[in-house]
């Protein structure tokens, strides 16, 4: 009897902990039966490429949410850094200069949000709402509300390869996404800073009493979010060969959705970056499946909202349930 109870406990625990992965497998299986073209190699690579931008932003969002924060400015950081990248490429500045400069700017912009939260004692929602609006306004001023094209030089072609190129038959954005997740997984799992992030999200007061500088951790996670938003901005701009002043609008919602669907708690202290990858894939596969089934984008918004709702309810009622 005791053995059966233990077995049931382990099965239940597995189903709860792996619910996002199980949901992804079920989604793929159902849509593959409805439309055999869904599981073709070309379509899978296309989904992964389309998902890469949201997935990369969602990694930064995971860091922030793990400390019970939120970053609403990611889309605005993407837009501004993308515009800066496009203008630098258009005057034929070398790519090896453009990339680090843009990533540094993104890191600094994210760090500013972190400083406002840490030093100004402002709630992350309010702080990043301010920076989101401010940076969007700066982007509009910088671009004069018009797209900035990268031009037609060899330099522009090289830059475009970031978003459209292939390495070993796999799109470059997928490689970038894979590297980002691998590095993030290592940081959160095997480094002191990763342990501090989980500790801060679990209990800020106790973390501070243990001698950990919580303000530095807060600035760090927002800087990471800014860095990855800028990286996503490079991919989007290079793919389109232009920077749109409205780029990144509502990207913060997709990123939050990926994190929540992936099982990271909005209360902080609990979650995995690989869960975020699964969450981003669920969103990406769902969007692609609905497109293949020729379902209106209006219904796609409803479907995405329902998926997020189910994920939040699962976190509230399953993730915390004692089995």
Curated annotation (Swiss-Prot):
TM segment ranges: 21-41, 55-75, 95-115, 122-142, 167-187, 217-237, 273-293
Subcellular location: Cell inner membrane
Coiled-coil segments: none
Domain of life from the UniProt record: Bacteria
MF GO annotations: transmembrane transporter activity
Key word Membrane present: yes
UniProt entry tagged with the keyword Cell inner membrane: yes
Keyword tags: Cell inner membrane, Cell membrane, Membrane, Sugar transport, Transmembrane, Transmembrane helix, Transport
Main location: membrane
Gene Ontology CC: one annotated term: plasma membrane
InterPro entries the record matches: ABC_transp_permease
Record membrane topology: Multi-pass membrane protein
The protein's assembly and partners: The complex is composed of an ATP-binding protein (RbsA), two transmembrane proteins (RbsC) and a solute-binding protein (RbsB).
Similarity annotation: Belongs to the binding-protein-dependent transport system permease family. AraH/RbsC subfamily.
NCBIfam families, A to Z: PRK09512.1
Role summary: Part of the ABC transporter complex RbsABC involved in ribose import. Probably responsible for the translocation of the substrate across the membrane.
The protein, known as: Ribose import permease protein RbsC
Lineage: Bacteria, Pseudomonadati, Pseudomonadota, Gammaproteobacteria, Pasteurellales
């Amino acid at each position: 009897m005791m053995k059966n109870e233990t077995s049931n406990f382990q099965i239940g625990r597995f189903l709860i902990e792996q619910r996002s992965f199980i949901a992804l497998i079920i989604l793929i299986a159902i849509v593959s039966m409805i439309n055999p073209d869904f599981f073709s190699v070309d379509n899978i690579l296309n989904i992964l490429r389309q998902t890469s931008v949201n997935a990369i932003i969602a990694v930064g969002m995971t860091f922030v949410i793990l400390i019970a924060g939120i970053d609403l400015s990611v889309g605005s950081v993407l837009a501004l850094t993308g515009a800066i990248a496009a203008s630098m490429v258009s005057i034929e500045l070398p790519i090896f200069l453009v990339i680090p400069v843009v990533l540094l700017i993104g890191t600094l912009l994210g760090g500013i949000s972190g400083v406002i939260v840490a030093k100004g004692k402002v709630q992350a929602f309010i702080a990043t709402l301010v920076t989101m609006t401010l940076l969007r306004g700066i982007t509009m001023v910088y671009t004069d509300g018009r797209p900035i094209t990268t031009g037609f030089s060899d330099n522009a072609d090289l830059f475009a390869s970031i978003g459209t190129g292939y390495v070993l038959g796999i799109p470059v954005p997928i490689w970038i996404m894979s590297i980002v997740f691998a590095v993030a997984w290592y940081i959160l799992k095997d480094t002191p800073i990763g342990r501090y992030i989980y500790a801060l999200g679990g209990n800020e007061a106790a973390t501070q009493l243990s001698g950990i500088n919580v303000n530095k951790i807060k600035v760090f996670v927002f800087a990471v979010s800014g860095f990855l938003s800028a990286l996503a901005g490079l991919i989007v701009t290079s793919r389109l060969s232009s920077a749109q002043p409205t780029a990144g609008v509502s990207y913060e919602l997709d990123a939050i959705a990926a994190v929540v669907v992936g099982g990271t708690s909005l209360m902080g202290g609990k979650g995995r970056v690989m869960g975020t990858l699964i969450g981003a894939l669920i969103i990406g596969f769902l969007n692609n499946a609905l497109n293949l089934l020729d379902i209106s984008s209006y219904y796609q918004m409803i479907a995405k909202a329902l998926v997020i709702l189910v994920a939040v309810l699962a976190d509230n009622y399953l993730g915390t349930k004692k089995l």
